[in-house]
Structure formats: structure tokens, C-alpha cells
UniProtKB/Swiss-Prot annotation:
Chain segments annotated as coiled-coil in the UniProt record: none
PANTHER family: GLUTAMATE--TRNA LIGASE (PTHR43311), GLUTAMATE--TRNA LIGASE, MITOCHONDRIAL-RELATED (PTHR43311:SF2)
Catalytic activity: tRNA(Glu) + L-glutamate + ATP = L-glutamyl-tRNA(Glu) + AMP + diphosphate
Motif 'HIGH' region per record, residues: 9-19
Upper taxonomic lineage: Bacteria, Bacillati, Cyanobacteriota, Cyanophyceae, Synechococcales
NCBIfam families: gltX_bact
Name of the protein in question: Glutamate--tRNA ligase
One Pfam family matching this protein: tRNA-synt_1c
Top-level taxon of origin: Bacteria
Amino acid sequence: MKVRVRLAPSPTGTLHLGTARTALFNWLFAKKEGGTFLLRIEDTDIERSREEYINDIYDGLKWLGINWDESPTIQSERVNEHKQIIKTLVDKGFAYKCYASEAELDEMRETQKRNGLAPKYDNRHRNLTPEQESEFIKLGRDPVIRFKISDEKLISWNDLIRGKMTWSGKDLGGDMVIARRAPGNSIGDPLYNLVVVADDSAMKISHVIRGEDHLANTAKQILLYEALDLNIPVFAHTPLILNSEGKKLSKRDGVTSISEFKKMGYTSEAMANYMTLLGWSVPEGINERFNISEVSEIFSFKKVNKASAKFDWDKLNWLNSQVIHEMSAETLLENLEPLFKENGWHLPSHEWGINLVGLIGPSMVLINDGVDQAKPFFEEQELSDDGKKQLEIKEAAVILKFILEKLADSDAASFSKEKALDLIDQATKSCKVKKGVVMKSLRAALFGTLNGPDLIQSWVLLSRFSKDRARISRLI
């Protein structure tokens, strides 16, 4: 069987973490099997679909390294084909017009609720006579079109993740609506389950890989495949992604879209790595820190868990820090320089920038951390409480005055690590203090705090701007 899989997002919002994980599993499976990964934009919700969301989906997938193999299919462009299929189902007796009003349906559901029953359409208009239909038309009622689902029908399939699955027709909510209300003999807007079957068949999809929240839809869609005498694809239902409280991850949990993760400073490699781990167990001997192109060679649904996956911020942060620490200084600078420019910061030289990221990179978890850590090199910082306390000791002023006088006799462009160390030794001897006192006082004067990356390297970088002289002189 030629493997053809698809991602079918609805452009009613930005690319969600769960949708991106589904895309990743589809892509990995296609790569493993030498198949084709396709993209279909399900934009039939005209009121909520937006062009900006379509672009966000495209951009998010590309950023993650998930590229599709053929031009995207736009679902709304196939609406005439969808309506023709609905007409065929009606003509063959698999579907019918239902004239029940919304008020009648609400009353039906309320009655069922009072009797302790689950809401379910009671199929009241399944067998209307022509005379009954005429009466409803005279009343001005516009019908929906429903597909017949027998309560006695058992629907089974072999799920690649969950094994043998069986649903009973009586648990599917009664005859399902496949087209919205429309006047006369016209067919209303086709609905989800119908158009998915129509498009998956037209695209020759061999495997449908999606979240477990689609299990009931799969049962309904299999009935449509059978009625239309179409080949039924193989199904795989991935586990849900839960928040820390064990509830389905939603917008209420804060960041859920790929574009938001990107803005926060997460790397595409770490995101793809982490999303693969959300539901997939790493085979023995494989490190959890990997590249998705490597995983595509070993990916298997046998290692995808049935149980839901909990989102773990600590794990994602660890992976992101690993990716950053593995970056070359050139790559890290490429990521950071646009952020520096946004803040109005300009590098005195490329070499200076390379040295800066080499200094701050090891302590970064997010790309955006580089902005905070680089800020003291571009902008003078307010004194922290511990910095103020250090500069209030009587020796501090003497130390800083000595260092400033020595700096005045040196060339900023040639200031080096060796010269910095020598100057600290001179200050220690001349001021008759411990080296630690000199270094703490100097750090507080230069950076406003007693904490930070290596002081000597930091000082050498700052000296390229001659900012060390300016900052010390303001404190004396």
C-alpha cells in the first residue's frame, strides 16, 4: 500500500500544539514508510476562517521543519463535489431531509435529560411520507440532511495505536446531520464528517492519523465510506495532550500555539523534539535529545502510547537549553542579532558579537534569555541591593579610582584578558585588599550586580565600547 497521509487543520485559529503534534506524527510516519505527507485546509467554516490563520499554519509547519509534498488542498474549493455526494446519498436512500425545528430538537433533548438519557436525535423524520414533507414545506421549514445510522449496527476497525475498536450505532447520537439547513430542493453547506470522507477519498489517503477525540467521528465516517462504496483508510488515534492538572490542554492554560512558543524563544528543533515525546516512547538505546529527521528512520506506532500525555514545561525547557548549548556561536548570534537590533543595540564588530554569545550562551534556556543577559553590555544597569552594599564599603572607591587611573593610560582597543588580570593584581596589592573585594567592587561598578558571567571576559567586552571607563567614573 502506498502511504499517503494528511494534516487537515481548520483555519479558525493559530496552529495549536496538538495540531502540530498530529502533523509531526503524520510526517514521521510518511518519511518512515517512504510515503507522501499532504496538507488540506478545512475552511468550510466561512464565518470563523481567516487568511491570516492559514498563513500561520503554513509558517508554523515550515518553522518546525514539517514540509508537505504536494500543493495544499483547499476544502471550500470542492463544495460542489461535496453536495453531489450528499445528493447521491439521498437518492440511494442512505440520507434524508429532516424538517425538525431547533425548538423541537431542544424540547426532545430536555425530555431525554429529564429521563436520565444521553441527548440523541430520535430519527423522527427518517421515514416521512411525501404528504408529510409537503406539509413541512408549506410551513416554510428548511430541512437539514441526515445520514441514517442504525442502532443495531456495529462499527469495527483495527487501530494502529489502540488495537481492535468497536462502536455501536446506538452510541453515535442518532442519524447525523451532513448538510445544514437550506430552502427548497437545494443542499445546504456540507458538514465535517461528510466532507472529510469525500476529501480523504479524493486525495487517496491511506492512513488517517489524528487525536483520540475523533474516535466517534471515525465510527461515523466508516459508515459513510461503506455507503459510498469507498476504500476505508487505516486509522490511528493519538493520545490527547493534558495540562499539569490532567485536563485537556486549552487556551486557558496560556501558551498553546506554535507562534507563541516561537515568540517566547523556543527553538524549532526543541519544539519538534519535545512534541515527538508527547505520546511516543523512545526506543531503548535512543537518547531523548534527537533530531526529527533521525527519528523518522525508526518511528513506529507500536511506540505511541494509548494513555494521554502530560505537558511538561521543565522537560521542554531542558531540551531547549540543550539545543542552544549545542549551537555554534555563529548560529546563536544569527538568532540573537535581530533581537538586539529590535532593542536598538549594534555590535561593534562581528568578532565582538561572537565573543558575547560565547559568554552568555551556556546559561541560556530560551533564545530570548540572550536579550536579558546581553543588556548589561549595551545599557548601564541600576545598582542592585547587593551591588549598592558592595560599593558602600570604604575600599570600593579607592579600588575604582586606582583602576580608572590605570585605564586612562591604556588603549581600549588593545585591552585584553591578560591586561585585565594584571590590573586586578595591581589593585589588590596597591589597595591592600583581597582579590575578591577588587573583583566584587569592579563587577558592581560595571554591571550593577555581584552576579553574572565570567568577570574578566565581560570586562574585556565592555572595554571595546570604553564603557568600563564611563561607568566607573560616574561612581567616583
